Amino acid sequence: MSAILKQRVRYAPYLKKLRTGEQCIDLFKHGQYLGWSGFTGVGAPKVIPTTLVDHVEKNNLQGKLGFHLFVGASAGPEESRWAENNMILTRAPHQVGKPIAAAINDGRTQFFDKHLSMFPQDLTYGFYTKDKPNGSNLDYTIIEATAITEDGSIVPGPAVGASPEMISVSDKIIIEVNTKTPSFEGIHDIDMPVNPPFRQPYPHTSADFKIGKTAIPVDPEKVVAIVESTSGDKVPPNTPSDEQSRGIANHLIEFLEHEVKQGRLPANLHPLQSGIGNIANAVVEGLASSNFKNLTVWTEVLQDSFLDFFESGSLDYATATSIRLTNDGFKKFYDNWDTYSKKLCLRSQVVSNSPEIIRRLGVIAMNTPVEVDIYGHANSTNVMGSRMLNGLGGSADFLRNAKLSIMHTPSARPSKVDPTGLSCIVPMASHVDQTEHDLDVVVTEQGLADLRGLAPKARAKVIIDKCSHPDYKPQLQEYYDRSVFYATKKKTLHEPHILRDVFKMHLNFQENGTMKLDSWDQKF
């Protein structure tokens, strides 16, 4: 037992349950229902998942030792190895990584995505274990901790996610105490699940409001093993902003400045929500260098750019369920713990993504889709309507309930044969996650379309005019004009479409590698 482990585990009875990963292998059987801590690749268990996949590889047990796996969102690289070894029978509600996506799209893993605010509560309702043959609880939850308090409660690390709910509905719990990661004690605010009809309103009225519980309570009798973990989180470098993403950010900031001038937003805006990726980075960079001050953030995930945002002096406070930093970012965070720990809070995902709180605070939500159609429907998950990327995540939690719901995307993306082979503005989205009723603004590097108060045909005109790529604008305009002509004859002018043509851009991409049509009369 290392000295630092003994220091971190302040509940002495747990030290009698100290095990190695190998000593835990026999606890696991094919078909069990497992919960993991973690969110967006940080705070997930490492020792037990790695030990189990090593065991499968060593003994050729691929397909013979598989599990129903639940994680708050995406886990770390350990999940990729599980997917490569056919160890994931079912998975929810969100994932990231080529191996797990391949397993889903090959049909080896059954995946269901769900709004991240709803997934943990639905787990406590028994929705995901209703067909489990031996009870409705998870068999095991494996949770990473950075400390354990005197009463046995768990202090998470850089992610809270769905851990409180998983622990509450788990038969047995394994705690991995990560002694590589500094203790995060004091930075969390934990709400434990209370199911209807006893659930009370959330009292949060500002981004910095706290309930005051800094650790996850647990029944010590359920804890069957304590395992020391000495591996840190492995987060790949962030995608840097580029000219295109900075163009999108500039349009957005100009729009927000206009909203302030018109009196629709206060000078320090409302709490901001932003995803991850180069567009989100560019937006954060743009806000940090703008004239906005005393800003707050209410979001799912904080990444490296938020540390610079704090340092700019523009950001007062940020709250999320995960702080997903690179190695350099974590070092900077730990080196300045006294500064950052006073300015941010990590909460469970049912709180960070709560529709009630998002609506009350008037959050400004900004997310990136796969595609947006001319009437304002957005696809966030399924490429060409069928191939799963990562899952819905929390985008709809925010976009359905925010004061301003913004989708930002490049106007076009490259394909293998055409540098603008994929238009992100299409006649009809091949899959719909956010409806026309949810979005207020669509923005690309070409421009910004303000959709508020517009009927469908007016939305189509402004989206085509402001957001589409020049390579596609005439083609999209022609589709719209033909649809209006057709719908006029049919007296179906509310939201004009020609169903025989509406997916021709997608079909042409599948056949020819580009969405550029020779003609709308082209046959497929």
From Swiss-Prot:
Subcellular location: Cytoplasm
Reaction catalysed by this enzyme: acetyl-CoA + H2O = acetate + CoA + H(+)
Record bears the keyword Hydrolase: yes
Binding site for CoA: 275-279, 390, 394
An annotated GO BP: cellular response to alkaline pH
GO cellular component term of the entry, any: mitochondrion
The family this protein is said to belong to: Belongs to the acetyl-CoA hydrolase/transferase family.
Record protein name field: Acetyl-CoA hydrolase
Gene: ACH1
